[in-house]
A protein has these predicted regions:
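Short internal beta-strands
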Residues: 36-41
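GT-A fold catalytic core of metal-dependent nucleotide-sugar glycosyltransferases
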Residues: 59, 83-159, 169-171, 176-181, ...
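A structural signal for well-ordered alpha-helical segments within the folded catalytic domains
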Residues: 23, 85-89, 209-217
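Short, acidic, metal-binding catalytic loop of nucleotide-sugar glycosyltransferases
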Residues: 28-35
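Juxtamembrane luminal stem/stalk of type II transmembrane Golgi/ER carbohydrate-processing enzymes
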Residues: 1-9, 21, 53-54, 124-128
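Glycine-rich phosphate-binding "P-loop"
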Residues: 1-17, 70-79
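Active-site-proximal specificity loops/subdomain of glycosyltransferases
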Residues: 20, 43-97
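Catalytic core and acceptor-binding pocket of nucleotide-sugar-dependent glycosyltransferases
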Residues: 169-243
Length: 243
């Protein structure tokens, strides 16, 4: 299945050491009908994924460099930082090509296609549809977002009940990231990659060791810790559910 008129795709990355994760990810994504592409971090991963035929995969720049991710996978290791720089760069590159990209970690199991909700199109978005204006989770507010990120709160019902108090000021988890190919979406993802790969010397990003840390620092005031200083009232939920 191609990205089609929606120009939307899911993108994930992995090497041969997490091949079981990659195959499991692709199995569920394919069963759910999600347009997805796997960026192979090494040649071995590409060869094994390509041998399955139905998996859309390609060699990332690191695969051409015969790169290997060290066993520790510490965020402070040089090999991890190279991986993070490549990953953010590839996401940015696809967004710049005009595609809305949902970046997903490989250890996530997708049971349903998120496209109808994220793109807010088709029958699901119409009045009376699953994500229509009268739905508990209408898709229209998210459609206007240039960037969206998951949090460590895994329950949408809990989020609604709590009026998004944690989401508004908690830690943002880069395990699921949505970047739209809008002018602001393109600018943000380009800056995200820049701040991960080549942070300005002496900047707040220079000392950070992961793309998640960089993302959180980009959307918060300097020295504002997650959960401290953020608005904790129900302003976010009221904007989505004015009733």
């Amino acid at each position: 299945r191609s990205a089609g008129a929606d120009r939307f795709l899911m993108l994930t990355f992995g090497n041969a050491k997490v091949l079981d994760h990659l195959l499991n990810f692709c199995h569920h994504a394919r069963r759910a009908g999600i347009v997805h592409v796997v960026g192979a971090v090494d040649v071995d991963a590409f060869t094994k994924l390509a041998s399955h035929g139905e998996i859309a995969t390609y060699k990332t720049p690191l695969a051409f460099e015969r790169y290997t991710l060290d066993g520790g996978n510490s965020h402070s290791s040089s090999s991890w930082k190279r991986f993070a720089a490549m990953r953010t760069g590839e996401v940015a590159r696809v967004v710049q090509l005009g595609y809305d990209v949902l970046h997903s970690d490989t250890d996530i199991i997708w049971l349903r296609d998120p496209t109808p909700y994220l793109m807010c199109a088709g029958a699901a978005a119409r009045v009376g549809g699953e994500f229509g204006s009268e739905s508990r989770f209408p898709c229209a507010p998210l459609r206007s977002a240039d960037v969206a990120v998951s949090s460590d709160n895994m329950g949408p019902s809990r989020a609604v009940a709590g009026r998004a108090a944690y989401h508004a000021s908690g830690t943002f988890n880069s395990g699921i990231l949505l970047f739209r190919a809008t002018p602001d979406g393109k600018r943000f993802v380009k800056a995200w990659h820049q701040n991960v790969a080549e942070p300005a010397r002496g900047s707040r990003f220079a000392r950070l060791t992961s793309d998640q840390q960089v993302f959180n620092n980009m959307v918060r005031k300097e020295r504002q810790w997650p959960g401290v200083g953020g608005r904790r009232d129900s302003w976010l939920m009221h904007s989505i559910h004015p009733d």
